[in-house]
Regions:
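Conserved helicase NTPase motor core
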Residues: 1-11, 15-19, 50, 58, ...
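P-loop NTPase Walker
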Residues: 1-96, 194, 248, 277-280
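Helicase P-loop NTPase motor core
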Residues: 19, 23-31, 258-261, 267-326
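ATP-hydrolysis module of ASCE/P-loop NTPase motor domains
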Residues: 13, 73-75, 93-177, 200, ...
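Short glycine-/polar-rich loops that comprise or flank the Walker A/P-loop
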Residues: 15, 44-48, 74, 225-228, ...
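Switch/connector loops and helix/strand junctions flanking conserved nucleotide-binding motifs
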Residues: 58-62, 85-89, 238-241, 271-277, ...
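Conserved RecA-like ASCE P-loop NTPase motor core of nucleic-acid helicases/translocases
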Residues: 44-56, 76, 206, 232, ...
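Conserved AAA+ ATPase "sensor/coupling" helix adjacent to the nucleotide-binding pocket
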Residues: 66, 112-116, 278-286
């Protein structure tokens, strides 16, 4: 049974909607019920519904829960950004000869590239190089404007350019390229853009607070012209800034989607009162966030303990000790 705030989200009609959903608010249930509503009440062909999550496991879980809800399988598309866009690219003649770069091969190309541009090939340095190349692509920052926290800027520029050139020689794509190339095609090829806009007339997006600028731009293009985008997220839960996540994009929804309906799932079914109150008191110190009313629905007060620890290693040891005592 849906709560009033859940029902409002599920029954949202056409047009853009941003639903604020904290932990324990029944977010996945709302998304699956929303898909059901679009098909059974809205008359939307299931093959025109695209549901994007951030992990393969989350996509599989949502699909299984949807099938359980409907009692049978429907051709709704569930996937991650990378899996969905890889599927789109593979259908294009210009990309049929390209292969996806696995981690081992990527490390080999990075090592070769680092040697050519006279950079360290140490394991930690290679890891930072990989992270920085990914960050540049996902934030869409101009190479000339990127400031590396680990290497001289001119070295990173040479590394990036040589890495891209080597991949092109072997017709290889890394995971970030799946998004970069999709965006390029959406902008450069009107027929490609139109085809996928018609293919997916309704978009549902999970964990919107973890989106980066590149992902946001692709979704913005795909959702046009009707903007039937149902986005669910919680700005209080964003932890992937180091990967280029842009939770601030949630605050810009009204600029990109005029007339967007902003809803909130108010009920928390996971936490007891004391834990919920303490969490809200702490997070309320964030200067930039959506103001939320969260109502605890779980009986009992709950136990709360404040512990100060020296570092992450001490924190991990403490948690292991607590778990062993349970």
């Amino acid at each position: 049974m849906l709560s009033p705030s859940q029902e409002e989200a599920v029954c949202h009609g056409s047009g853009p909607c941003l639903t604020l959903a904290g932990p324990g608010s029944g977010k996945t249930y709302v998304l699956t019920r929303r898909i059901q509503h679009l098909i059974t009440k809205g008359g939307v062909p299931p093959e025109q519904i695209l549901v994007i999550t951030f992990t393969k496991a989350a996509a599989l879980e949502m699909k299984e829960r949807f099938i359980g809800l409907m009692g049978q399988e429907y051709p709704v598309v569930f996937g991650t950004f990378h899996s969905v866009f890889y599927g789109m690219l593979r259908r294009e003649p210009g990309f049929r000869t390209y292969r996806l770069l696995d981690h081992k091969s990527k490390q080999a190309i990075l090592k070769e590239t680092a040697y050519v541009v006279k950079m360290s090939c140490a394991e930690d340095d290679l890891m930072h190089m990989e992270q920085e190349i990914s960050y540049i692509k996902n934030t869409m920052v101009a190479l000339a404007e990127y400031a590396s926290p680990y290497f001289p800027n001119e070295k990173i520029i040479k590394l990036y350019e040589h890495y891209e050139a080597r991949k092109e020689v072997y017709h290889l794509l890394d995971y970030d390229d799946l998004l970069v190339k999709t965006r390029e095609l959406l902008y450069k090829d009107p027929s490609f853009l139109s085809k996928w806009q018609k293919r997916f007339s309704y978009l549902l997006l999970d964990e919107v607070q973890d989106m980066n600028a590149l992902q946001f731009e692709i979704i913005r293009l795909l959702a046009l012209p009707d903007n039937n985008l149902f986005a669910v997220g919680d700005d209080d839960q964003s932890i992937y800034g180091f990967r280029g996540a842009r939770p601030d994009l949630m605050f810009s929804f009204e600029n990109y989607y005029p007339g967007v309906k902003i809803l909130q799932l108010r009920d928390n079914y996971r936490c007891k009162a004391r834990i919920l109150q303490a969490s809200l008191a702490l997070i309320s110190h964030n200067e930039i966030r959506f103001t939320k009313e969260i109502l605890g629905q779980k009986e009992g007060k709950g136990n709360l303990e404040v512990v100060s620890l020296a570092d992450k290693k001490a924190e991990t040891a403490y948690l292991v000790q607590i778990l062993k005592q349970q």
